[in-house]
């Protein structure tokens, strides 16, 4: 069988299981109201939590950065591509989100995936043991696999199980690794307990705050700041394409850790640096996030979250108990979840269907992603469409059962 035959068979299998992904094309800027596939829609799909992706100040900064630094960096960070914009941003990030450390330093990456690969592969290797939450992001998991470290997975957020694994470990280097906000459930890791376990067992704690940075904590400084946590053995990863509204990611840690990443992190060394204009725009984003406007946007988002929690309980499906901008609604089967997504699409609402392998089999769900750009009128439209779709689904199931029993 040829490679193409094998791939065609694989695609057919995905179709049969309701697992093939399809891209949609956005014709306008990322916002609550967009033109997608030629239609006007209200989007509940993006991670633009503060509604900054189309913010005029960020757009202007991006254009200014391009005028000043050009359209590309021209090389890797170690071979000519590290601009003043990158260096300034790293200093700003360390000052903004590095309050957990006495000697914080930041390192900017082109993507969150690359930042997580760097942290896993450069800080752990043969002889090290990584203790990983069962629901960690795929980029962390891939980094662990590449690290060649021993990996022990503990049940989601189960600190007792983690403590038992740490007690039994004789590894010289131990890394506890966890998302802060879990991207498909919206719950927050038990960070206080994780820090305590790390310190008790001489381990380091690596946290991925992709969905918390900019939203959680005072001035949006992140999940560690929200929990008022400090420790010399913390490594903090954040992303800049979600709440920050631009692109890229960063690692903040003790300056020695960051210097080691510069020397040994392959996903930092062997890639072209992001355009300086991107870093310039992120600097503008940090000013908005930390200012009065950022506070107002976070307050509005918090109100939207509480309203959404209430409206999801009015459907026939199972909401996940989330207090973050990620509001999942578990339906179960792939086909039923896709049908629900299509029903919402007919109402001009884009709510993505999340299916395996992103979530466990049998827990396919709609993932409602909220933004400060949404209005309460947008939520009213969502509620009406969800109730209609869930009632129709329940009626269809009931009719099928009656037919089977006849």
UniProtKB/Swiss-Prot annotation:
GO terms of molecular function: 8-amino-7-oxononanoate synthase activity; pyridoxal phosphate binding
Alphabetical keyword list: Biotin biosynthesis, Pyridoxal phosphate, Transferase
Binding site for pyridoxal 5'-phosphate: 112-113, 183, 211, 239
Cited InterPro entries: Aminotransferase_I/II_large, AON_synthase_class-II, AONS_Archaea/Proteobacteria, AONS_Proteobacteria, PyrdxlP-dep_Trfase, PyrdxlP-dep_Trfase_major, PyrdxlP-dep_Trfase_small
Reaction(s) catalysed (UniProt annotation): 6-carboxyhexanoyl-[ACP] + L-alanine + H(+) = (8S)-8-amino-7-oxononanoate + holo-[ACP] + CO2
Binding residue positions for substrate: 21, 137, 358
EC class name: transferase
Cofactor(s) this protein cannot do without: pyridoxal 5'-phosphate
Pfam families found in the cross-reference section: Aminotran_1_2
EC number: 2.3.1.47
GO biological process: biotin biosynthetic process
Pathway this chain belongs to: Cofactor biosynthesis; biotin biosynthesis
NCBIfam families per the UniProt record, alphabetical: bioF
Protein family according to the UniProt entry: Belongs to the class-II pyridoxal-phosphate-dependent aminotransferase family. BioF subfamily.
Quaternary structure, from the entry: Homodimer.
Protein function: Catalyzes the decarboxylative condensation of pimeloyl-[acyl-carrier protein] and L-alanine to produce 8-amino-7-oxononanoate (AON), [acyl-carrier protein], and carbon dioxide.
Protein known as: 8-amino-7-oxononanoate synthase
Source organism of this protein record: Burkholderia orbicola (strain MC0-3)
Gene from which this protein is expressed: bioF
């Amino acid at each position: 069988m040829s490679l193409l035959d094998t791939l065609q068979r694989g695609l057919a299998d995905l179709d049969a299981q309701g697992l093939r992904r399809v891209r949609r094309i956005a014709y306008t800027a990322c916002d609550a109201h967009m033109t997608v596939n030629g239609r006007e829609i209200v989007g509940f799909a993006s991670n633009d939590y503060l509604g900054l992706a189309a913010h005029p100040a960020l757009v202007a900064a991006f254009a200014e950065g391009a005028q000043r630094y050009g359209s590309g960096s021209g090389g890797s960070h170690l071979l000519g591509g590290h601009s003043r914009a990158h260096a300034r941003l790293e200093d700003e990030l360390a000052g903004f989100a590095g309050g957990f450390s006495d000697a914080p330093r930041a390192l900017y990456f082109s993507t969150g995936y690359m930042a997580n690969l760097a942290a896993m592969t450069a800080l752990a290797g043969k002889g090290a043991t990584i203790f990983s939450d069962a629901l960690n992001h795929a980029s962390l998991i891939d980094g662990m696999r590449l690290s060649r470290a021993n990996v022990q997975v503990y049940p989601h957020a189960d600190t007792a199980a983690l403590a038992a694994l740490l007690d039994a470990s004789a590894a010289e280097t131990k890394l506890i690794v966890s998302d802060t906000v879990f991207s498909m459930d919206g719950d927050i890791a038990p960070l206080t307990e994780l820090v305590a376990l790390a310190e008790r067992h001489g381990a380091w704690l690596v946290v991925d705050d992709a969905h918390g940075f900019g939203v959680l904590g005072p001035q949006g400084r992140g999940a560690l700041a929200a929990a008022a946590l400090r420790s010399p053995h913390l490594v903090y990863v954040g992303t800049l394409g979600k709440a920050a509204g631009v692109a890229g990611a960063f690692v903040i840690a003790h300056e020695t850790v960051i210097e080691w990443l510069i020397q040994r992190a392959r996903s930092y060394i062997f890639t072209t640096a992001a355009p300086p204009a991107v870093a310039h725009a992120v600097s503008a984003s940090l000013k908005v996030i930390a200012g009065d406007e950022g506070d107002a946007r976070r307050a509005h988002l918090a109100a939207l979250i509480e309203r959404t929690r209430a409206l999801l309980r009015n459907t026939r499906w199972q909401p996940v108990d989330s207090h973050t901008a990620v509001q999942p609604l578990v339906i179960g089967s792939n086909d039923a979840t896709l049908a629900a997504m299509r029903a919402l699409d007919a109402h001009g609402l884009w709510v993505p269907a999340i299916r395996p392998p992103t979530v466990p089999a049998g827990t396919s769900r709609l993932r409602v992603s909220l933004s400060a750009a949404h209005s309460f009128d947008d939520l009213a439209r969502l509620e009406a469409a969800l109730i209609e779709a869930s009632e129709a689904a329940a009626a269809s199931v009931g009719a099928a059962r009656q037919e089977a029993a006849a």
